[in-house]
């Protein structure tokens, strides 16, 4: 059995859990996201050590799930963002993921595109296997 990795067992699992949401899903920061988009990025602190030993390493990993929609009309963009956030929250299994807060929306520029974005804080426990 191959060793577990955070890329596969955590970010990949989050991406899979979000597969039913109508958005492009990125498990790393894209150069130019296609909206609507969900981007999974490490938060700070990224890793909180829980068990560190010769045979077991267990950490709490903290992520930001960034929901992004096009910003053409303020009212429509906010409605689209709220719908995307509710879809994301519904797709993530609360027993596996710890969801804490959804940050207020903000406008951001990515390249030449203006986006309305909001961050969702998520934590998950990960144990390294051999």
Question: PLM features: residue spans?
Answer:
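Residue-level detector of conserved, well-ordered beta-strand and adjacent loop positions
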Residues: 41
């Amino acid at each position: 059995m191959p060793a577990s990795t955070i890329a596969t067992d955590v970010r990949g699992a989050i991406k899979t859990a979000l597969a039913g949401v109508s958005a492009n899903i990125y498990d790393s920061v894209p150069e130019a996201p296609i909206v609507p988009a969900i981007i999974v990025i490490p938060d700070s602190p990224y890793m909180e050590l829980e068990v560190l030993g010769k045979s077991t390493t267990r950490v709490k990993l903290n992520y930001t799930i960034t929901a992004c929609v096009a910003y053409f009309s303020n009212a429509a963009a906010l409605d689209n963002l709220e719908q995307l956030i509710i879809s994301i929250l519904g797709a993530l299994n609360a027993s596996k993921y710890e969801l804490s807060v959804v940050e207020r929306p903000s406008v951001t520029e990515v390249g030449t595109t203006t986006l309305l974005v909001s961050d969702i804080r998520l934590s998950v426990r990960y144990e390294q296997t051999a």
